[in-house]
Amino acid sequence: MSFDIAKYPTLALVDSTQELRLLPKESLPKLCDELRRYLLDSVSRSSGHFASGLGTVELTVALHYVYNTPFDQLIWDVGHQAYPHKILTGRRDKIGTIRQKGGLHPFPWRGESEYDVLSVGHSSTSISAGIGIAVAAEKEGKNRRTVCVIGDGAITAGMAFEAMNHAGDIRPDMLVVLNDNEMSISENVGALNNHLAQLLSGKLYSSLREGGKKVFSGVPPIKELLKRTEEHIKGMVVPGTLFEELGFNYIGPVDGHDVLGLITTLKNMRDLKGPQFLHIMTKKGRGYEPAEKDPITFHAVPKFDPSSGCLPKSSGGLPSYSKIFGDWLCETAAKDNKLMAITPAMREGSGMVEFSRKFPDRYFDVAIAEQHAVTFAAGLAIGGYKPIVAIYSTFLQRAYDQVLHDVAIQKLPVLFAIDRAGIVGADGQTHQGAFDLSYLRCIPEMVIMTPSDENECRQMLYTGYHYNDGPSAVRYPRGNAVGVELTPLEKLPIGKGIVKRRGEKLAILNFGTLMPDAAKVAESLNATLVDMRFVKPLDEALILEMAASHEALVTVEENAIMGGAGSGVNEVLMAHRKPVPVLNIGLPDFFIPQGTQEEMRAELGLGAAGMEAKIKAWLA
């Protein structure tokens, strides 16, 4: 879409942060209003993360107004809230391409702009990186400042607290801004508290604070009295004791939608030494009533009509794999009160809403704490319960040691329901489920299953749930199932594949939901088609049978080729001295960028036409 100067006259003046800083302060509330309307106009046309950005408009304007970005370094955690940042940093006219193939990246991305200091997508990394950046800036000696913006969800993760604990120890000059967008604004946010925040961040208070500590440093009782008095004054209106104990100078909470007040507080804090912590209160979805009322639904949106206030309803076609999992979960829980389900802040995405309502005492959302989720599941298993960890492939990476040390070594029966396996689409490099087969396949005692359709998915979940000799995993993709009939649940024989079609010369060994395309290729080439079903243990007898009765083999998977299921097939053949030619089809050795699932599969040759072309070229 073209930028409408008449509709956004103040925003039209801002092509860069340098131009932003030339605006008089009095014009900034109008800029915020236009920026918020432009964000609504753009995202409703293009789709994308929405409610978080609406809540950070004033903060974004204030930060870029006070700090000399990009010389001063601004780090956004996760990046859902960074759309206004992109608009103000030279990407205004391209914001309509965000999350699209070849368009703006969905998150801050170092390769896209000098303003994007840290590439992000996963949560709770900003403070750790910010400490390193701040230490480097101190050694550089050019008075470069470092600011990290982190949300109230992301700050609950252990990594954020590890970083803050370290910052309190080495005391770098840096600012952490906590964007607290809980549903209700705290009672502490108001004129008195905003005034106190400006007072406590001001030079007079800061110099008195430090000077008093120096003067009375040799008099322990008075030093302690001063500390307690300061804490008492702050404690009357602020909840910052935890952050003070970690070594930060805590200011807040303040109104995150008062752009002029934020500018005053940030200017006061900019030159303070040591780690600083500014707590701001915002409203997710600010300025668009439907998003304010339902920020979860409006967190990420498809294209929609803003005037209607409603998102388009799904077509009501085939269920998603997440829905298949959620239905199976409820069905199984109704029969077995030992079932416990765990998610790290992915209730909606993992299809667990209905389960959480029907079985609240057996549902555990542990927040953004993947490591804890896995070891918590281990504890439940030790206690005689049957835990299921529902987690995205890309986030399971964050709990790898816990899978190894706390579950697999102890042979605990934990079922991992791995959603978003393979290509996920618009979220790009940081969210592709490209590696789970590779990083799980090497773990002893692990059973790994790859369903080819929703019925197999249910049977495999059932099989894994009833497997008691160690951990098991079922991986399934983002998107809709294929529409096969659902049959009664029964346990599958562990490590056994099935031949779906008999052909000649060539055998295609398929792992997972690329099966419909693999079937088309097998039909076209008159190839044998095998649904391998298990990545671990592999059906070695079936692999050797295919090698003995065919001239060449092809493996198909939506996982990195390196270390994936196809690599396992190669290992079996080499171990048995069967030098049969094998073509491994899967994800190549680079991070897959954004684009729709269909676009990326076509580009990578994972559709029927692409697979057939690869096979023909290889056989030629």
UniProtKB/Swiss-Prot annotation:
Family of this protein: Belongs to the transketolase family. DXPS subfamily.
Binding site for thiamine diphosphate: 80, 121-123, 153-154, 181, 288, 370
Species assigned in the record: Escherichia coli (strain 55989 / EAEC)
Xref: InterPro entries: Dxylulose-5-P_synthase (IPR005477), THDP-binding (IPR029061), Transketo_C/PFOR_II (IPR009014), Transketolase-like_Pyr-bd (IPR005475), Transketolase_BS (IPR020826), Transketolase_C (IPR033248), Transketolase_CS (IPR049557)
GO MF terms, alphabetically ordered: 1-deoxy-D-xylulose-5-phosphate synthase activity; magnesium ion binding; thiamine pyrophosphate binding
Residue ranges crossing the lipid bilayer per the database entry: none
Catalytic activity: D-glyceraldehyde 3-phosphate + pyruvate + H(+) = 1-deoxy-D-xylulose 5-phosphate + CO2
Protein name as catalogued: 1-deoxy-D-xylulose-5-phosphate synthase
